[in-house]
């Protein structure tokens, strides 16, 4: 189950990077819903970045706030949240 979620997240991130935001966001969301991810906070960070890139600041901020833990993803998420709140 976890590998499927990770594969969905990885594919979603690649699609977002290629400019296919809608499909990439859908796969990132689906991968997070499946659960069992190796690095769920990193996936939430990527989802927040994708939302921000698509212009959805509110969902981006929610995704950044959902990043928990004690690694660098949390610090990055806080910085991205500050960036997302700029007018």
Question: Each PLM stretch: what is its role?
Answer:
Residues 2-9, 38-44, 72-76:
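Generic helix N-cap/helix-start motif at coil->alpha-helix transitions
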Residues 34-36, 69-70:
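Structural marker of alpha-solenoid helical repeat scaffolds
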């Amino acid at each position: 189950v976890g590998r499927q979620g990770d594969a969905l997240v990885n594919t979603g991130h690649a699609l977002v990077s290629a400019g296919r935001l809608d499909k990439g966001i859908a796969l990132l969301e689906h991968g997070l819903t499946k659960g069992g991810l190796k690095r769920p906070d990193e996936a939430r960070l990527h989802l927040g970045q994708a939302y921000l890139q698509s212009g959805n600041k509110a969902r981006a901020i929610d995704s950044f706030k959902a990043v928990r833990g004690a690694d660098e993803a949390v610090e990055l998420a806080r910085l991205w949240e500050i960036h997302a709140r700029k007018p």
